[in-house]
Structures are given as structure tokens and as C-alpha cells.
Regions:
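Structural alpha/beta core scaffold segments of enzyme domains
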Residues: 1-444
Length: 444
């Protein structure tokens, strides 16, 4: 059996509670201190450095708190260069704030037109998937999203064809917004799965169970973790899925007609270079800093907890500082880009390098505790990811500083003993080839 359906998704605008605003403090020495609504202070710093030719040392961007962004702060919006331009020209401090109406004048989630074709056997097992998507962009810049690849990784299917094309329109360039690409692409895939369940007269939850896969077929690798089957089971139990009647207009809640449905989702966990610095003062208080931001995801709290756990300290004895471009490098703060993996290896050495009672005050050399499973422990020898400096034999200990830099781990070299990768995942439909379909969408 086959399902062939076309789905349209509309534009969506971020419109967070806090509108975009930039305050540029022009200092007497010509340097700029900028308070901006951004998900990446160092990204804004780099942008201004390239646009205005200013040295990075003369630009400091801060974003202590961000009142929501949803992706609209991943790149600088136009109020930032306007504020900097005015400040440099007037040689005085300037603030530019966008109105609520102006919040509709820049990036947005682009509209899409997607065609999903599914082929399955009588038991609902997927035999072929073809997902073709057409997205929009501006005429002066290409904006692409990961719209179709989710269809090749969420379910088990050996024959998959994916295509994505752009149509240049007289509009402003779109922008990443809350699970960019997946939020649009998964709508089409899951709607098509529901239509397949209806055509095959199979419960939509059971259909997804039958097509579950533990591997990402797009990359030929197993998932590091995937608890989707357990999620299916718990969700069905808690919502009473067994009481669902699949017939339309068959279920009521009081005087209202209701329907029960479900859908799956998938999202990527990206890792980028990140770094942090940890500092113990003479009172034993740990301060950890990184140039990441808090966009309402609780970064202040989470990073403080991670640092406290790694250092063996109380939460109230740890302070996490963020939102400053002068701090150690961190990636853009988004739902899939985190700096937490740099905080733990940074704070952990401090656990051994700073005795809880600061016995160095008495002029004695601290005794480093042995790491479990090792004969002895030497901070300089074992903390390969950290550059550590600490005082020795001093009656007035200087602060202890630990810095850590992490980057994503490269993929291991291919193993000769492993099975060869799957052949190119293609499926040729009898109606229209992928190439012809894409061209007709662009030029039709």
C-alpha cells in the first residue's frame, strides 16, 4: 500500500517576550561595551569586528539575561549595527530598541511545501520513503534547513530518497527557530505515518512500534541512547491509549467531539568547542565562568550544579558567571549547543587542587587525594584537559585558577573489521523522479 500526500507549513515569527535591543556604551578611550539581546556574545563581537573593522579587544558584549529568543538571537539583528554605527559617529552612548511591530521585520521560520510518499507491506512495515521539500529564502542570501533527513533516521526503512530545494523570493532571509527544519519536516512525516496507519487499519502507535529502529540509517551508526519504545509504552499507559476509538466522531468529552492522536519526534545533539575557567578564592568559594548565555533554559542553575558536583562543593559555595564576550570561548546558546561538557572537566581538577579546609594557610603543603583505581594522583599528570596553577606552601594562599578547553571528539577511524556501509539510499518511484519533481517545484 502507498501514501502520497503534500503538506504545507506556514511562516512563524519568534516574537519572544523581550524585544531585541542594543545598548552601546561609548567609553573615553574609544572602546565599546555593549549590552545586547543575543544567544552568543562572542558571535556578536566577531560580527562587529568584521563589519566595522574594530579590534576585538575594543568590543565587549554582555548579555547577562535574555528574555526569550527561540533562535532569533543566534545572529545579530539590525538594531545592533545601527546602534554601533550611531555610537561611533556621535561618540556617545546609544540605545536602539525594536518595537513589537518591528519584530516582524527580520528572520522567521520559513514556509515549506513537502511531499511525502510512503510504501509499506500489508503488515505496515515500511518498504520505501520519499520526502521532497521546497523551502523559501531571500534573493540575497541562501538559508537552508534540515527538513527531510529526519525521514531517513526515525524509522526502519531500507529504501529512502530525500531532496530539498530552495525558492528565492522577495522576502527577508529566514532564521533558525525552535528545532529548525525538524519542526517542519516531522509534521509531514508523522502526518503521513498517520495516513498510512489509517489506510492499513493499524493502530498508529503500533505502526510506529513495528518500524522502530535502533540505528541512524543516514549515518549507518547506532543511537547512543534511544528510549522511544519505553516512551511509547509509558505514554500509552498514562493516557489510557487502549480506550481510544479510531473511528472519526466516535469519542466525546461532554458535549465536545474529541480525537486522540500521537506523534514522534527526533532532534540532534550537537557539540562545539567550548571552554571554561574555574577559580577558588582564599575563602574556598569557587567561581566558574564561560561566555555562554542563559536564554531561559536555566544555564546559571545547571552550570552551578555541574560545577559543584564536579568540585565536590556545596551549591551555595559556587558562582557561575556567563554572558560576557571577554570570558572563555563558548558556542552559541541554543537547545542543541551547550557548554556544559567544558564545565565539568574544568571544575573536577579543582576538587583535588583545593583542599576543603585550605590547610595551606598553616604553611603546609596539601596532600593530594588519590584518584579511585590509581596508585597515586598528580593533578598536573592526570588532568590532560586542564591547565592548572595553584600555590604551594604559603600562609596567604593566592586564588586557584583552573581552565579547561573542550571540543567535539572526532569520529574514530574506520574499522576494517566492521561491515561495509549500506549502499546509497535511493528509491525510484514509477510516477516522477526526484530530480524532475524538484525542478518542477522551483520553476513551476
Amino acid at each position: 500500500m502507498q501514501v502520497d500526500a503534500t503538506y504545507l507549513t506556514a511562516n512563524e515569527y519568534h516574537n519572544p517576550m523581550e524585544p531585541h535591543a542594543s545598548t552601546v556604551l561609548y567609553k573615553a578611550d574609544g572602546t565599546l561595551e555593549i549590552h545586547d539581546k543575543t544567544q552568543g556574545t562572542q558571535n556578536c563581537q566577531d560580527y562587529l569586528h568584521k563589519v566595522f573593522g574594530l579590534p576585538k579587544a575594543s568590543i565587549r558584549v554582555r548579555a547577562a539575561f535574555v528574555g526569550g529568543a527561540f533562535g532569533s538571537g543566534l545572529r545579530p539583528q539590525y538594531q545592533l549595527p545601527l546602534a554601533v554605527m550611531a555610537a561611533l559617529h556621535l561618540q556617545r552612548s546609544v540605545r536602539v530598541t525594536l518595537t513589537r511591530q518591528q519584530m516582524f521585520t527580520f528572520g522567521y521560520r520559513p514556509r515549506t511545501e513537502q511531499r511525502l510518499r510512503l510504501g509499506a507491506d500489508v503488515n505496515g512495515q515500511l518498504l520505501a520513503i520519499a520526502h521532497d521539500a521546497l523551502g523559501q529564502t531571500s534573493r540575497f542570501e541562501d538559508f537552508t534547513e534540515h527538513v527531510v533527513e529526519w525521514s531517513g533516521m526515525l524509522y526502519q526503512c531500507d529504501n529512502v530518497a530525500l531532496s530539498y530545494r530552495l525558492a528565492s523570493l522577495d522576502v527577508y532571509t529566514p532564521l533558525d527557530m525552535r528545532a529548525p527544519g525538524a519542526a517542519s519536516g516531522m509534521i509531514a512525516l508523522e502526518c503521513a505515518m498517520d495516513e498510512l496507519a489509517c489506510a492499513a487499519q493499524i493502530d498508529p502507535l503500533e505502526l510506529r512500534r513495528r518500524n522502530f529502529t535502533a540505528n541512524n540509517a543516514n549515518e549507518g551508526k547506532p543511537y547512543s541512547s534511544k528510549e522511544l519504545l519505553a516512551c511509547y509504552r509509558q505514554g500509552a499507559e498514562r493516557f489510557g491509549w487502549q480506550n481510544r476509538n479510531p473511528q472519526p466522531r466516535s469519542m466525546r468529552h461532554g458535549n465536545q467531539l474529541i480525537g486522540w492522536g500521537m506523534a514522534g519526534g527526533v532532534w540532534e545533539a550537537m557539540q562545539m568547542k567550548a571552554s571554561a575557567k574555574a577559580r577558588f578564592d582564599a575563602q574556598g568559594h569557587l567561581t566558574v565562568c564561560s561566555a555562554t548565555t542563559d536564554i531561559g533554559t536555566g544555564t546559571y542553575t545547571v552550570m552551578t550544579q555541574i560545577a559543584a558536583d564536579a568540585a565536590g562543593a556545596r551549591v551555595q559555595d559556587v558562582t557561575f558567571v556567563l554572558g560576557d564576550s571577554s570570558l572563555p570561548t563558548a558556542p552559541l546558546q541554543a537547545d542543541r549547543l551547550r557548554c556544559r561538557r567544558s564545565v565539568r572537566p574544568c571544575a573536577r581538577p579543582a576538587r583535588y587542587c583545593a583542599p576543603k579546609c585550605w590547610n595551606m594557610r598553616a604553611g603546609c603543603t596539601p596532600k593530594w587525594p588519590a584518584r579511585p583505581g590509581s596508585r597515586s594522583f598528580s593533578p598536573m599528570a592526570t588532568c590532560t584537559r586542564a591547565a592548572i596553577a595553584w600555590p604551594c606552601r604559603t600562609s596567604s594562599p593566592a586564588p586557584l585558577t583552573v581552565s579547561s578547553k573542550c571540543k567535539s571528539t572526532p569520529s574514530p577511524a574506520p574499522d576494517a573489521n566492521r561491515s561495509p556501509p549500506l549502499p546509497i539510499r535511493q528509491y525510484s518511484w514509477k510516477s516522477t523522479s526526484t530530480r524532475t519533481l524538484a525542478q518542477s517545484r522551483l520553476h513551476g
